[in-house]
Regions:
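Hydrophobic, well-ordered secondary-structure elements that form the walls
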Residues: 86, 163, 173, 193
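Catalytic beta-strand/loop cores that center a nucleophilic Ser/Cys/Thr
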Residues: 92-167, 214-221, 227-231
Length: 231
C-alpha cells in the first residue's frame, strides 16, 4: 500500500544471500512459536542490523530483540485477538491492535537505562505502563548496537510492544499492523518503513490525525508516489 516491490524469501535464507539482492530494506515478518527455535533468523538479523533499514513485526520483533542481546519470555497469558490497546509513547496516542503471540521481549535485558534520555530514571520498571503514565519513551544502551528506545506499551498488561534503534535504521513492533480483518490504527507503520528507506530521520514521527488533515492517505497512491521501488 506504500508502493514497495516485495520479494519473499524462505525463512532460513542466509543474510548474505538476502543482502546480495540489493534491497532498500529488509522486513522480518510474523511467524509461529518460540523465537528460540529459529536461531538462523536471529543470525540473519544480526548480520543485517546497521547495514540497511530493517522493520519487524511479531516474531520479527522478537528475533530483532534477541539479535540485540535481549531475552524473550513466555507470557503468563498470551495476546490473541483484535482489540489489544497499545500506547505509542512517541505520540501519546492509543492504538487498537491485532495480536497473536505467546512470547515477548523483556525490555530491561536489552541494557541499562540512559537517564538523560529516560526522564532521569535510572532503574527499570517491571510494568511498562509506568512509562506511559510518565509520558516517557525510555532509552537503553545495548552492548553492541547502541541505543534502543521503547516506543510502544501494552495497556492491558504492561508488556513492551515496540522498539526503535537510535544508532541503526531499525524498528519493530510486537503486534500486527497488517491485520485483515482487524483494526487499521497501526497501518502508519508501513509508511514509517517507507520513510525510513527514503532516509527520513524522523520516520516514526507520524501523527495520523494531523497527517490525514494535511492530505496524506496512508494506503493510497499518495504514499506510492513518494516511495521508490524496493526489494
Amino acid at each position: 500500500a506504500v508502493g514497495c516491490e516485495v520479494t519473499v524469501v524462505p525463512w532460513d535464507t542466509p543474510a548474505d544471500k538476502a543482502l546480495a539482492m540489493g534491497p532498500d530494506g529488509i522486513f522480518f515478518s510474523n511467524g509461529p512459536g518460540d523465537p528460540e527455535s529459529v536461531p538462523p533468523v536471529v543470525d540473519a538479523v544480526r548480520a543485517c542490523l546497521g547495514k540497511l533499514p530493517v522493520f519487524g513485526i511479531c516474531l520479527g520483533n522478537q528475533v530483532i530483540s534477541m539479535a540485540a542481546g535481549a531475552e524473550i519470555e513466555k507470557l503468563p497469558y498470551g495476546h490473541h485477538g483484535g482489540n489489544e490497546p497499545v500506547m505509542n509513547l512517541l505520540t501519546g496516542k492509543v492504538e487498537i491492535t491485532a495480536q497473536n503471540h505467546n512470547y515477548g521481549l523483556v525490555f530491561k535485558t536489552m541494557g541499562e537505562l540512559v537517564p538523560e534520555l529516560s526522564g532521569g530514571v535510572t532503574e527499570h520498571f517491571d510494568d511498562m505502563r509506568e512509562w506511559s503514565r510518565r509520558g516517557i519513551a525510555p532509552v537503553v544502551m545495548t552492548k553492541e548496537l547502541g541505543r534502543v528506545r521503547l516506543t510502544h506499551v501494552n495497556l492491558n498488561d504492561g508488556t513492551p510492544e515496540g522498539i526503535q534503534f537510535l544508532d541503526a535504521p531499525t524498528f519493530s513492533v510486537q503486534y500486527h499492523p497488517e491485520a485483515a480483518p482487524g483494526p487499521t490504527d497501526a497501518h502508519y507503520l508501513f509508511t514509517a518503513f517507507a520513510r525510513l528507506m527514503d532516509g527520513d530521520v524522523d520516520y516514526l514521527d507520524i501523527d495520523i490525525s494531523k497527517d490525514r488533515l494535511a492530505g496524506w492517505v496512508f494506503d493510497s497512491e499518495d504514499a506510492s508516489a513518494t516511495a521508490k521501488t524496493r526489494a
